Amino acid sequence: MITINDYPIGNECYPNNERIYKIKNYDTDYFVIDFKYETDLDISILIMCKKYLDDVFNNPKVILVMKYVPYSRMDRNIEGYMFSLKYFCQLINDLKFHKVLVLDTHSNVTTTLLDRCEEIDIQQYIDEIFDKEKIDYVFYPDNGSMERYSEILKLPNDITYFYGNKKRDLQTGKIINYELVDCPDIQNKNILIIDDLCAFGGTFKLAGEKLKEKGANDILLYVSHCENSIYKGELIKSKLLDKIYTTDSILSDWSSNLIYNIGD
């Protein structure tokens, strides 16, 4: 979904599925395009919008808000696969936005590849959760999240963290082993899991099982980006988690009473 200064655009189509681009009369040369990725169609709509603004307005200042960056998981060269993030970022760079705002990218490769890129600070979302909930420990579900968030997040003085370690089959992507590292006594304690992305939720289900085995009480999850595919996985049905906090960067199905929109 794309909006220009909060005005939806490209959301209607002709019978053959070509987009209809209804425009409004803008009395400004300052624009914020909000890009919420749902399908690759949104990329073509984005291109049309930026080309239009550049064509009609004299040197417009156009800021792109792209909380979730498509293809950010494909952030390296892997034999037999296209380095798709690289080419997507090249496409965005070619559009020459004044600024590109992103949220909690999968790795720093994304922010390195994007020109004039600034990151939205997730500290505000974590602080909001601590204001609402009684949290005893923070848990990072893997080494990557531990290394990343332990550097950039400021936790309350009385809160410490521990983390998980997972081993995947690189061919199938399936997690074949999961363990808790440096786990304190969490009997009857409330745990907040923090990570960037949830697809089917397999990692968080494994983490929830391990935390419950150690006696954890409430388990909450914060992810910056949550895909609708969470409903196709076992995480919600498992009832291991008590609440899931996420932004509106991807998710459009808020039907589960476990999922809460944060930062809205």
Predicted features and spans:
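PRPP-associated nucleotide enzymes
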Residues: 1-264
